[in-house]
Amino acid sequence: MSTLEKVSERIKNSLFVPIDNNNMQDSINSNEVSGQVATLFANVPLGPVDPILGVSTAFKADTDPRKVDTSVGAYRDENGKPYVLKCVFEAEKRLLGAPKEYLPIDGIPEFNKLSAKLLYGDAMVGKEKRMVTVQALSGTGALRIGIIFIRKYLPAGTVVYISRPSWTNHHNICKESGVQSAEYAYYDPKTKGLDFTGMINDMRAAPNGSVFVLHLCAHNPTGVDPTHEQWNIIADVMREKNHIPFMDCAYQGYASGDLDYDAYSARLFLNRGFEMFSAQSYSKNFGLYGERTGALTIVSHREDVIPKMLSQLKMDIRAMYSSPPTHGARLVTTVLSDPELTALWVKELKEMSGRIKDVRQKVLDALIARKVPGNWEHIVNQIGMFTYTGLTKPQVDILVNKYHIYLLGSGRVSLAGLNNKNIDYFADAILDAVTSTQ
């Protein structure tokens, strides 16, 4: 292949979009006719407001003293305040004065080893040489690097399947990475639980060798997870179809308070011999939301391809952001490499997940006490930060406009935003919303 052909192929496989000179000239001419200053950017459309962060922005602008924010997935303590974990605070004290030099392109080696070990545990023993891990910009960055790798090195036309519903950014990441995404059944609004039959049917109907994004635990936004028995059936079907798991690991330890229990599905796939991807985030379980700390791990059947895979991942990282940030990864490394700090972290995870479970029960009790129409048991049956309430869009509008309780239009509520001071107010609002829309 000639140099020109190589460049052409590289451009074809990238997200490069050539400038349309005709449209550009039309834009300039239009501006000149209207008397406006000419600009190349007149045809740039206004993008939609992010469905999650847009609600948070509206909350911050609201001056009503009763307002409650249950939109953004960030932990809050009983007083509704952001919480810095004690283990993180101690690690930060140890890191005072640490140098601010560039990290290697693939991040801190010890951080990468500890991240893979945290997720895969003893399941990775004997498989380490078939795994490659790189530090990434939290879960979003890990997903983005992984999806780009899929576009470049999996068979052309490989489709990435995402649960219906899912975290809204999953489809955005695929689109901006030049990869086609589709949906598979997941949530049953009638039972407010898992549509397991629909999920399995969609996996069987998907083309062989498709990629399935699977939430490790604490499914976002529904809070509905498969049982261990169901995970084993999912693995059976994916093996039959040669599908590739891509685990989105945002809540390990935060869901149940047990790091090993929450990692069951990832370790199952590894033990069953899958080639697979995993994207880890330390935003929730370490409270490092703004530090953008995460990791991407890819598992291969063969050791000899790992150096080549790492070289390509590093090329993509270099072109995207050159090298990852230091502070968050150093914090995680400091905690996970110190037995005392690790024990403190595990204790704090149990406390955070325990508070969320307590909020679930108190919300259910408050709704039952008010005799709110309907069955609300799903609130305690779901797991993790979110509950998929089942509220309709008109009911959500009442909560937002009348009660200044901010949540997503889908009815997803971040339970971290509720506490003993506002649960009764929240339940009163739901009673009004449900009864007034019947």
From Swiss-Prot:
Pfam families: Aminotran_1_2 (PF00155)
Transport keyword on record: no
Cofactor: pyridoxal 5'-phosphate
Protein name: Aspartate aminotransferase, cytoplasmic
GO biological process: 2-oxoglutarate metabolic process; aspartate biosynthetic process; aspartate metabolic process; glutamate metabolic process
Family classification: Belongs to the class-I pyridoxal-phosphate-dependent aminotransferase family.
Note: In eukaryotes there are cytoplasmic, mitochondrial and chloroplastic isozymes.
Entry-annotated residues carrying N6-(pyridoxal phosphate)lysine: 284
Reactions the enzyme catalyzes: L-aspartate + 2-oxoglutarate = oxaloacetate + L-glutamate
Function: Plays a key role in amino acid metabolism.
Source organism of the structure: Dictyostelium discoideum (Social amoeba)
A GO CC term assigned to this protein in UniProt: cytoplasm
